[in-house]
């Protein structure tokens, strides 16, 4: 931006994909009846004690490794003290002094093709707060979310545009999704983004007052929020005024940021060590084992799909936009070697059905076994693309029959026996002798007419390539 350099730091809160909460055995499940998944620990009953969720620590280690972070094997927790209705204990268990991950990085590719490494300052484990629902001038609290395991991932203030912020969050989301660390559904709050934005004159190394924008729930809103806030701050600075340090929220309706509160003084959270959780020394062999079993990331799959399976970059990218689609593709290619055909069918007719019904592929009846069977039958010349159009609607909506059973029941097998095709053609030629008189002047029309009658008699169940070879021979025999 003219005259000013944009400084952006990103903080992401990511809900961990665990069955129970971070420090209690309460079940984790989105969308349940409010306040039905909170126990005595979540509600801070006197005398209750936290216990660390081992799975949550494993997921944090996976995330640290994928983000090229230094992993601290001494696990400690701290208390962040503040009073607010969504926090029954009066404090949050977090990792202020000793985060599990430090000094990481993530590479993004800009629209112009240039690469940029985004430095990540820290990753720490903490617990979520209760969900607040504002309605009819009242605030309702749902403690189902209270205590759910989170990792907070904080970048250094190294991003310089809305594009970089969006690409960073998109890439981070992809990594965490393919690691199965989180379902990262921004619309459900399992990936929440806060931005810290400030402007400074070009050439200056001093940071100006930053404005924090809270809880952005989509990539498009991140873009809009950054662009609006940059323009708002620029207008203030061009008037020789000072940008006030504030916390703001993004308004979907007006595509603008709105003041929540001013930060005149920094809040003192009086951090101190969590006395109810002793330091835990993680076994390095256990950490190494978790890392060695890390799932294949999308970037690794992308390279394999193109270099080993022969997919185009475009097809590989489309497959990898959905974890469900990727998993389905992986299962299917174990059952057939026509990898390109699998990809083409997934991203064309199958994706069209998913878009129409607003579903993911795991929500329909289609199985990898049935899709692979269709492709294998085509490759073996048992059915053609025409028969496929009959079979596909059935297997997309039902899994009670195998493809082979459907083909048999509907008599869809291609006739490939040359003797059988010859007999059929001879009968048609004998019934259309007058056509042969036109063969010398209009051969294509004669062949097309006879082939049309052949397809009509067999419901299209004749291999057209074999039939085309035979029809010319049979016509010439009868001239």
Swiss-Prot record:
Keyword Ligase belongs to the record: yes
InterPro entries named in the record: Asn/Gln-tRNA_amidoTrfase_suB/E (IPR017959), Asn/Gln-tRNA_Trfase_suB/E_cat (IPR006075), Asn/Gln_amidotransferase (IPR018027), Asn/Gln_tRNA_amidoTrase-B-like (IPR003789), GatB (IPR004413), GatB_C_1 (IPR042114), GatB_Yqey_C_2 (IPR023168), Gln-tRNA_amidoTrfase_suB_CS (IPR017958)
UniProt keyword GTP-binding present: no
Source organism superkingdom: Bacteria
Gene Ontology terms describing biological process: glutaminyl-tRNAGln biosynthesis via transamidation; translation
EC numbers for this chain: 6.3.5.-
Keywords recorded for this protein, A-Z: ATP-binding, Ligase, Nucleotide-binding, Protein biosynthesis
PANTHER family: GLUTAMYL-TRNA GLN AMIDOTRANSFERASE SUBUNIT B MITOCHONDRIAL AND PROKARYOTIC PET112-RELATED (PTHR11659), GLUTAMYL-TRNA(GLN) AMIDOTRANSFERASE SUBUNIT B, MITOCHONDRIAL (PTHR11659:SF0)
Family recorded in the similarity comment: Belongs to the GatB/GatE family. GatB subfamily.
Complex formation: Heterotrimer of A, B and C subunits.
HAMAP family: GatB (MF_00121)
Name the record gives this protein: Aspartyl/glutamyl-tRNA(Asn/Gln) amidotransferase subunit B
């Amino acid at each position: 931006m003219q005259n000013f350099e944009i400084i952006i730091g990103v903080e992401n809160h990511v809900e961990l994909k665990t069955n129970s909460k971070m420090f209690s055995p309460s079940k984790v499940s989105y969308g349940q009846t409010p306040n039905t998944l909170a126990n005595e620990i979540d509600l801070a009953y006197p005398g209750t004690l936290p216990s660390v969720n081992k799975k949550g620590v494993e997921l944090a280690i996976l995330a640290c490794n994928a983000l090229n972070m230094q992993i601290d094997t001494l696990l400690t927790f701290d208390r962040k003290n503040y009073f607010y209705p969504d926090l029954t204990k009066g404090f949050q268990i977090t990792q202020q002094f000793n985060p599990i991950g430090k000094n990481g990085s993530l590479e993004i590719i800009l629209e112009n093709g240039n690469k940029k490494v985004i430095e990540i300052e820290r990753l720490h484990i903490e617990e979520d707060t209760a969900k607040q629902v504002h309605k009819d001038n009242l605030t309702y609290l749902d403690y189902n979310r209270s205590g759910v395991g989170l990792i907070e991932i904080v970048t250094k203030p190294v991003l310089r545009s809305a594009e970089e912020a969006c690409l960073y969050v998109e890439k981070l989301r992809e990594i965490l999704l393919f690691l199965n660390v989180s379902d990262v559904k921004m619309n459900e709050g399992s990936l929440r983004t806060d931005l810290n934005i400030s402007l400074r004159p070009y050439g200056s190394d001093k940071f100006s007052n930053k404005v924090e924008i809270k809880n952005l729930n989509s990539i498009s809103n991140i873009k809009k929020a950054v662009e609006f806030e940059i323009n708002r701050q620029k207008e203030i600075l061009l008037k020789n005024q000072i940008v006030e340090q504030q916390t703001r929220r993004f308004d979907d309706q007006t595509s603008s940021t709105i003041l929540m509160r001013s930060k005149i003084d920094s809040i003192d959270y009086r951090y101190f060590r969590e006395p109810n959780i002793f330091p835990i020394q993680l076994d390095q062999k256990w950490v190494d084992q978790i890392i060695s079993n890390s799932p294949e990331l999308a970037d690794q799959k992308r390279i394999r799909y193109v270099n080993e399976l022969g997919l185009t970059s475009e097809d590989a990218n489309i497959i990898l936009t959905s974890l469900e689609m990727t998993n389905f593709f992986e299962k299917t290619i174990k059952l057939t070697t026509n990898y390109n055909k699998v990809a083409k069918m997934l991203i064309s007719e199958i994706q069209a059905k998913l878009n129409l019904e607003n579903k993911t592929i795991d929500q329909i009846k289609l199985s990898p076994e049935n899709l692979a069977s269709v492709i294998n039958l085509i490759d073996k010349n048992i059915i053609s693309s025409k028969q496929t159009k009959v079979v596909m609607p059935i297997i997309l909506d039902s899994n009670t029959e195998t493809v082979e059973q459907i083909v048999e029941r509907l008599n869809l097998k291609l006739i490939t026996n040359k003797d059988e095709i010859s007999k059929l053609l001879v009968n048609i030629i004998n019934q259309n002798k007058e056509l042969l008189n036109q063969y010398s002047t209009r051969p294509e029309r004669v062949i097309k007419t006879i082939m049309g009658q052949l397809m009509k008699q067999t419901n299209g169940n004749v291999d057209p390539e074999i039939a085309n070879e035979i029809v010319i021979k049979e016509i010439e025999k009868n001239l």
